[in-house]
Structures are given as structure tokens and as C-alpha cells.
């Protein structure tokens, strides 16, 4: 996109950017430039994890996941664990198949740099309280990455309200 002055290329770029604006309005993102198109959530989660791994995470840092994560939100962090000697902690599910915020809070340590969680579990149907988790995390300068594959088609999304750092 934006690679030519030919009228067809300009028309394609305009359509592409109009789509970005439509998505921005639909999910109430602050700015259309926050919208990054990928082939899917797996690619998006890999992109975020790899970028954070290269630019932000260091040996000894910790990442917090939950026991409900889909493989696509586990594997990229697992690779970082191996390549950068980063620790992964897991917040446990309760007997109802949910993850109370207390289970997340008790797993946060001073070394926690990223919380990577799903919005809605495709295993139990549990909806995680993303806004509350983000508030807790941001108070401790922790980045929040949300796997929204199940949440996006089933929940009304408001990125400004959720305030997470990345939503795939």
C-alpha cells in the first residue's frame, strides 16, 4: 500500500486506509494508526512477542500467562523463555473454569514485565476482566497483551475502555 502513484494503486491504498478507519471506529481505538493488519491473531501475537523480546525483555524478566491460553498465545512466549532465559508464570483457573483477578494478582512479581491473556476462553467460555487486569498491570508498569480471537466476534470492543497495550 502506498507504493505507487498509478491511479489503481492510489485507489487500493485509499480503500485500505478507509478500512483501517472503519476498524478504528468499530473498536473505538484512539487512532487509526494503532490498527496493524496481519494474516491473523497467531501472526499478531508472534509479532508482539518477538518485538518485546528484542526491545524490552531481558534475562530474568517474567511473563504471566493463564492456564486457559491458546497455543498461539503460549508458543511465542515459550520461545522467548528459551532464547532469553525469561520465566513464565501461570495464573490458575478455579473450579468454575474462570480466572479470578486475585489469581492473576498473586502471580505478579517485581520481575513481571508482560501479562499475556485471552479475552474469552475457547475452552471454558470464561470472559476475563481485561479492563481490571490492565488497571492492575499498568499500576505496576506491566504491558498487557490480549488474545482477542474469541472475544472479538462475541463481545462489544472498546479499546479505550479496555486500555490494553496490544489486542490481537
Place the predicted regions along the sequence by residue.
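Pyridoxal 5′-phosphate
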Residues: 1-168
Amino acid at each position: 500500500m502506498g507504493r505507487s502513484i498509478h491511479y489503481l494503486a492510489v485507489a487500493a491504498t485509499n480503500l485500505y486506509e478507509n478500512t483501517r478507519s472503519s476498524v478504528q471506529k468499530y473498536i473505538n481505538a484512539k487512532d487509526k494508526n494503532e490498527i496493524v493488519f496481519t494474516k491473523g491473531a497467531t501472526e499478531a501475537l508472534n509479532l508482539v512477542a518477538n518485538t518485546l523480546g528484542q526491545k524490552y525483555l531481558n534475562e530474568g524478566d517474567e511473563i504471566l500467562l493463564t492456564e486457559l491460553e491458546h497455543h498461539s498465545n503460549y508458543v511465542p512466549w515459550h520461545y522467548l523463555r528459551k532464547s532469553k532465559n525469561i520465566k513464565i508464570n501461570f495464573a490458575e483457573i478455579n473450579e468454575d473454569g474462570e480466572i479470578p483477578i486475585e489469581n492473576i494478582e498473586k502471580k505478579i512479581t517485581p520481575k513481571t514485565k508482560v501479562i499475556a491473556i485471552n479475552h474469552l476462553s475457547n475452552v471454558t467460555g470464561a470472559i476475563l476482566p481485561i479492563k481490571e487486569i490492565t488497571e492492575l498491570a499498568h499500576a505496576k508498569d506491566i504491558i498487557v497483551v490480549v488474545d482477542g480471537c474469541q472475544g472479538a466476534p462475541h463481545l462489544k470492543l472498546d479499546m479505550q475502555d479496555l486500555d490494553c497495550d496490544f489486542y490481537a
